[in-house]
């Protein structure tokens, strides 16, 4: 019992809601001296705040729980949940094992977060073991657990197990349907995902977002936008950040600037919070759609305090891709002044900028800075350095750089070197690199074409023809390139030699007229002399 002289003060301390860990440390120390550190509601509040709060410390929660003379069951669930959301989800499994050693039985609130940890760890074996434990504990048809299991199997790309569980469930709710839809979408099976989507009698924003994201991840961007349009027409669900990021991504890949602007206006009209992720997506979309001014406008309006490395990367990379090389490098220095730490992608953007601008000295500086920052250069960083050197005509240096790399050269590295050799007239090295490329990627049509071009430039026409013969022998077919033009909201696709475009007669007529004005002796009806459209 509390002493009457201090009961009011003690009760006040026990009920105090902490707002920071430093405050919690002080109160905990005080209660230890008073012998009240295991009293409620301090125990439950301490475990809840330290394990689940964004400003908490789940390791502290675990230590606190372990030292209690009679740790409550809910405390174990709090700590397991906290670790499942942390940078160390494997610790939740350790807590679970210790819980079992104490003879405590997991309940319907324990398993879902253990399954979340197994998903984050990509541990299929662990997930299967947890499922077996659920069955043994008699919780196999708990709706919360079943929905989490479907989501877990989906994260493992195991649609079969997810579907089997879905079909066997005696009761389903909207979360169940969303879970199986997301499982199919994550695995890239958008056909099955769409069948589930069409079968659903009820949909919410998660449903629509999963279907849209599934199409985006499969590269079916037009279908993603069609689903979004359907969502808007039905009006039953308001799009959220996840929805809009996927929609913006689709616009970016399609180069659909007008559509992207419409989406941006929608975000503003419905007062959707312009989070860092949304702003970064908009910057990336505008840059990829050729409107660097709009990209800059989005970035400029953002408060520096609300930015992160990803947003700075998007605008730095966007400026560089549009030829604003010096501006992108200056912005990097501004980024450092703003106390935003660059990451590996930042240096990749900077190296790409140096490549476009022919800035060899600066590229070496950034490449060395990346190493000095403690990060290990990835394949993409090495590829950028090869591109920088090759574009600048330093093809021998690029070749030496590749030879001294601690990783094996990729097709993109050798491809950049090959282009540099061709552009700067080193045909001997070009032939050597071209042959290595074919060995590395024997089914890539572009590698044969690249070496054929080397032979043609060197007037070795027989060797050039042999490349086509080699392609035919290996069954490699040249994939026709295409261009896309967005005109007044309508997308026009142009492919070599094709005349299926609904205005092809008029287009060819204009080409003939243009050729005549330019005194070009070209027959646009001769497929051997031109590449055209559909």
UniProtKB/Swiss-Prot annotation:
Highest taxon of source: Eukaryota
GO BP terms, alphabetized: RNA modification
InterPro entries: E_motif (IPR046848), Pentatricopeptide_rpt (IPR002885), PPR_At4g14850-like_plant (IPR046960), TPR-like_helical_dom_sf (IPR011990)
Single GO term (MF): RNA binding
Alphabetized SUPFAM superfamilies for the sequence: TPR-like (SSF48452)
Region (Type E(+) motif): 489-519
Cross-referenced NCBIfam families: PPR (TIGR00756)
Protein name as it appears in the record: Pentatricopeptide repeat-containing protein At5g08305
């Amino acid at each position: 019992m509390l002493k009457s002289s201090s009961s009011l003060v003690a009760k006040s301390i026990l009920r105090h809601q902490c707002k920071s860990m430093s405050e919690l440390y002080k109160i905990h120390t005080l209660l230890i001296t008073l012998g009240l550190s295991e009293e409620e509601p301090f125990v439950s509040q301490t475990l809840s705040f330290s394990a689940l709060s964004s400003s908490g410390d789940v390791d502290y929660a675990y230590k606190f729980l372990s030292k209690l003379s009679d740790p409550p069951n809910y405390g174990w669930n709090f700590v397991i949940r906290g670790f499942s959301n942390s940078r160390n989800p494997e610790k939740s499994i350790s807590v679970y094992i210790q819980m079992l050693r104490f003879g405590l039985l997991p309940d319907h609130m324990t398993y879902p977060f253990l399954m979340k940890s197994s998903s984050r760890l990509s541990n299929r074996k662990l997930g299967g073991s947890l499922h077996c434990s659920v069955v043994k504990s008699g919780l196999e048809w708990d709706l919360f657990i079943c929905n989490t299991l479907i989501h877990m199997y989906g994260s493992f790309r195991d649609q079969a197990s997810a579907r089997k569980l879905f079909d066997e469930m005696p009761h389903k709710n909207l979360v169940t349907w969303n879970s199986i839809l997301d499982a199919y979408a994550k695995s890239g099976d958008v056909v099955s995902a769409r069948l589930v989507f069409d079968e659903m009698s009820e949909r919410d924003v998660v449903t629509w977002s999963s279907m849209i994201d599934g199409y985006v991840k499969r590269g079916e961007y037009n279908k993603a936008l069609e689903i979004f349009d359907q969502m808007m027409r039905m009006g039953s669900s308001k799009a959220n950040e996840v929805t809009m990021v996927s929609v913006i991504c689709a616009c970016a890949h399609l180069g659909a600037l007008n559509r992207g602007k419409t989406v941006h206006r929608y975000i503003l009209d419905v007062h959707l919070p312009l989070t860092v992720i949304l702003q970064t997506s908009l910057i990336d979309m505008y840059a990829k759609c050729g409107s660097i001014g709009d990209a800059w406008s989005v970035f400029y309006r953002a408060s520096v305090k609300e930015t992160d490395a990803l947003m700075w990367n998007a605008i730095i990379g966007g400026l560089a891709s549009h030829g604003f090389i010096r501006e992108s490098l200056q912005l990097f220095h501004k980024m450092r002044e703003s106390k935003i730490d660059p990451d590996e992608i930042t240096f990749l953007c900077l190296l790409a900028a140096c490549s476009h601008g022919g800035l060899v000295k600066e590229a070496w500086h950034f490449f060395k800075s990346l190493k000095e920052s403690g990060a290990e250069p990835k394949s993409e960083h090495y590829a950028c350095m090869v591109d920088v050197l090759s574009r600048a005509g330093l093809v021998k240096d690029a070749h030496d750089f590749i030879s001294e790399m601690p990783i094996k050269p990729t097709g993109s590295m050798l491809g950049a070197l090959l282009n540099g050799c061709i552009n700067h007239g080193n045909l001997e090295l070009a032939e050597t690199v071209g042959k290595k490329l074919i060995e590395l990627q024997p089914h890539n049509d572009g590698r044969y074409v690249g070496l054929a071009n080397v032979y043609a430039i060197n007037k070795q026409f027989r060797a050039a023809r042999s490349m086509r013969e080699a392609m035919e022998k290996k069954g490699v077919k040249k994939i026709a390139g295409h261009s896309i033009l967005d005109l007044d909201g309508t997308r026009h696709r142009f492919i070599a030699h094709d005349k299926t475009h609904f205005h092809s007669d008029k287009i060819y007529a204009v080409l003939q007229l243009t050729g005549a004005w330019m005194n070009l002796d070209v027959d646009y009806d001769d497929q051997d002399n031109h590449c055209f459209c559909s």
